[in-house]
A protein has these predicted regions:
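A preference for well-ordered globular domain cores
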Residues: 1-146
Length: 146
């Protein structure tokens, strides 16, 4: 394995504790990166079907909708145009934007919580066996609202 060295005296391979520790550290770091990528992939799955331009406007849409709910005189140039061009009442669009933003916030909260729980477990692993088992769980991780 990657952490064995050949011992010329005994003419056999022995575990190098230094190499084993380094291998374990590298594997943990790699799994931490894999975990971050997996979280991004799961988030991207939630956004499937939305063009990037629209995704980039989500924060602005929510900000305008919430401002209008709090003050009907608030400036809402983006939402006014979306409602006009889409042909839906402005108030209906505001409700939809707020509802979608809330749903998305909950979903992202679940993903973040799941990722952080995996990270906590990853940082606490002490053995290669624990690390391998956790790696399998991370590979199988899918979005589940709990």
């Amino acid at each position: 394995s990657e952490y064995h060295v050949f011992d010329s005296k005994s003419k056999s391979f022995k575990v190098s504790e230094d190499k084993k520790a380094e291998f374990f550290k590298r594997k943990k770091e790699s799994l931490l990166n894999t975990l971050a990528e997996k979280a991004d992939t799961i988030k991207s799955g939630l956004l499937a079907g939305y063009p990037q331009t629209e995704i980039e406007s989500f924060y602005r849409q929510e900000k305008e909708a919430l401002a209008w709910v709090n003050d009907k005189n608030s400036d809402t140039p983006m939402l006014k145009q979306v409602a006009r061009v889409r042909g839906v009442p402005f108030e209906v669009l505001v409700e939809k934007v707020i509802a979608k933003a809330s749903q998305f916030a909950v979903a992202i909260g679940v993903i973040i919580g799941q990722r952080q729980a995996f990270e906590d477990r990853l940082l606490a692993t002490k053995t290669l066996e624990e690390l391998t088992a956790l790696e399998k769980e991370i590979e199988e991780w899918t979005f589940q609202a709990n």
